[in-house]
């Protein structure tokens, strides 16, 4: 039996559920609804965000790698953004007038989350390609359609990378 283990880091993108509780979906939903955007702590903690297409490409490369490469291999984006930067980008991309509100940081919340993707680069020749702005634009587009049933046609909503399989 072939075994591959990948460790996934903070993935976002179209087809996320609006109530999944993750920071990207929370901020987008709050901004689109004109609600205050809730930041826990001072917002200077950092996170990295991996767009779903990049994740899928990394996973497919791992699945198609030689049998002696089993992992674990980190699949994520090592570029860090503060939570404040993320909130401000979401406000900008949605055109929202949302205000930022700050609540106490949970005691177990790390100041930084950033994957080391050295093995993915070395063994799979993989690195993320989608910049945060582009990924957020696609994700906001999806959420607008999902939340408001806008005039967005399904074929206009970006689709994640789909591999072609041969028989």
Regions found by a protein language model. Name each.
Residues 15-19:
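Short, solvent-exposed loop/turn segments at secondary-structure boundaries
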Residues 1-14, 25:
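Conserved beta-loop-beta element that borders a ligand/cofactor-binding pocket
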Residues 22:
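Acidic donor-binding loop at a coil-to-helix junction in glycosyltransferase catalytic cores
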């Amino acid at each position: 039996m072939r075994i591959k283990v990948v460790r996934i880091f903070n993935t976002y993108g179209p087809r996320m559920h609006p109530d999944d509780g993750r920071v990207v979906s929370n901020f987008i939903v709050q901004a689109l609804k004109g609600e205050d955007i809730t930041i826990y702590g001072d917002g200077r903690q950092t996170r990295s965000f991996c767009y779903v297409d990049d994740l899928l490409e990394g996973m497919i490369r791992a699945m198609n790698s030689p049998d002696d490469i089993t992992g674990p291999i980190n699949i994520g984006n090592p570029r860090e953004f503060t939570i404040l930067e993320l909130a401000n980008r979401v406000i900008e991309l949605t055109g929202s007038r949302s205000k930022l509100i700050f609540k106490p940081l949970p005691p177990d919340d790390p100041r930084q989350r950033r994957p080391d993707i050295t093995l993915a680069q070395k063994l799979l020749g993989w690195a993320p390609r989608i910049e945060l702005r582009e990924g957020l634009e696609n994700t906001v587009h999806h959420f607008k359609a999902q939340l408001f049933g806008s005039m967005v046609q399904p074929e206009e909503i970006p689709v994640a990378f789909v591999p072609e399989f041969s028989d």
